[in-house]
């Protein structure tokens, strides 16, 4: 038996990647700032918002990872819905805060039984090894969840809780962390700074690098679609 790598022969791997490409539904950004990128680099958000062509487009492998995340989120939502522990549960809830030029999609929005407060659940998938290093929510994930909660608070006038939920791609192990109020303040500050650049028509600064640091191995530069555009 031969292992197929492609070349002149059709492969399922090629068909799968093409299917992902043809069925992927991009969420067009209606605003300059989105929750999914707010905790990252403001300069990259500027490039995305102004339609700058990516100098480092995503590879097919990353789209497979994104799709896997969607599958895990869908399974988790269905099982949570079937648990009977929630008065309400909604999947993929859009949010918009026009005054802050902000929008996004909440993974899951719930009200636990007997609770009056809404809670934002921000889901992140990772392999089981990653759980070894988890000490709390990653800053970019905490800011994302907090920004959605802030948006709901602005809409409803009521306090909204937030939680970052990590799910193992290997065995559905779950680690979950409530998001402290300080992250709400940080998310709001990022929005205010980003909007200040927007008002002034300026491109946000590059993130600083330590001397000798390899930009291709530094988050968030390593996975940035505009790395060459920004760093040259």
Name each model feature, range by range:
Residues 4-6, 135, 151-232:
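Metal-dependent nuclease catalytic regions and adjoining charged, substrate-binding loops involved
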Residues 68-72, 144, 183-186:
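Short amphipathic alpha-helical segments
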Residues 74-82, 112, 136-166:
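Metal-dependent nuclease catalytic cores in nucleic-acid-processing enzymes
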Residues 127-129, 170:
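Feature marks short, surface-exposed loop/turn motifs that line or immediately flank catalytic pockets
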Residues 41, 148, 224:
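A residue-level signal for conserved active-site and pocket-lining positions in enzyme catalytic cores
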Residues 1-120, 129-133:
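Metal-dependent nuclease catalytic cores that hydrolyze phosphodiester bonds in DNA/RNA
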